[in-house]
Amino acid sequence: MKKLKVLSVLGTRPEVIKLAPVFNEFFRQRGEILSCVVFTGQHQDMATVLLRQFGITPQYNLKIMRRNQSLADIVSRSVSRLSRIIVREKPHCVMVQGDTSTAFIAGLCAYYHKIPLAHVEAGLRTFDKNNPFPEEIHRRFISLLADFHFAPTPRAARNLAAEGIVKKSIYVTGNTVIDSLRVLESQSGTRKLPCFLTREVLSKKIILVTIHRRESFGQPLREVCTAIDRIVRLPEVEVVFPVHRNPQVRTQVRRLLRPRSNLHLVEPLEYKAFIDVMKHSYLVLTDSGGVQEEAPVFGKPVLVLRQISERPEGLDAGVSCLVERKAAAIVGCVRHLLDSPAAYKRMSRSRSLYGDGRAAERITAVLLRHKTMLQRKRNEKGKNMMPQVPEVSMSIVNNSNSMIRAETGSTV
């Protein structure tokens, strides 16, 4: 029987991390699934490193990243290029992950071409359209367009049902990030720790800091840096801060913080190294969604530097808490966890709130269960849903595997 062709679109570091297990499962089922991967290059440098680490070779790279690009720039450069690829590849299904501009654009293109859309990590909500911006609106729009909603938790599934999404299209699978963590854990014995994790550093209480969201830019980031400057004065503490490459983060951090013996301002870490640092940390300060999912697996308290979170499961379980982005509030919460063994014990219970490591297996099983329907749908509507557009100019990069990469410029 003909294989099910799934065209997956990704462009950022989190998308690579969370789709890698699905691609592995597709490979395991390669007798039934033909996987085509499109990389938009939304986070060209950071995501490209991860693609190599996970052994993912995209068939197409749109290379859309530009310095100081706006959201409108990302959308305008991506839509026509991705549309042409969909016309060329004629997939049975398009798959996206999360709530990035890449996911939103791919969902829109799939809808325009009447291709069924599978949404991994569906149903996350803050119910505030501006927080996070623009992710909250992206994921709401994607939910309107999707045909398969792979919710990471029962709460996310309930959010979708409350919005009128057909219940039979909602599947609680767990979050694929837990799948990735399980794989990394199985390999942990063969890895060296990052060089800055010396014996002296490991003997202290390591605080891992990550910050990158748009709503953190400006005054909130200044407050975070002020808090860090106060925290590193504590002799028992080591702060590890992988500084995001976004100029609005990097410029401000470099201006406000100076390296000290116990303050490690480092380049963004490879994912494996980042997880190793997290495992050796005492607690985590972050505005990241993914870190809120990862840290509880290792029993690391998470102080969430945001006003609201679309991952309330950690808040309800008591392993994470929202902290106002004010220096005094941040320092106060850190000191409380440093000084109160009881408070730390309550927040440092190891919990796998977001899955059991089998999400990719469940996602693949659902798609294969609908294989005949998806193939029939394309065959019935194929000619009508494939508008005529100029042919895409390609160059072969791997003849043995028929890998095709899109050239930059106007060709895609």
For every predicted segment, state its role.
Residues 1-241, 246-399, 403-408, 412:
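Nucleotide-activated sugar donor-binding and catalytic core shared by glycosyltransferases
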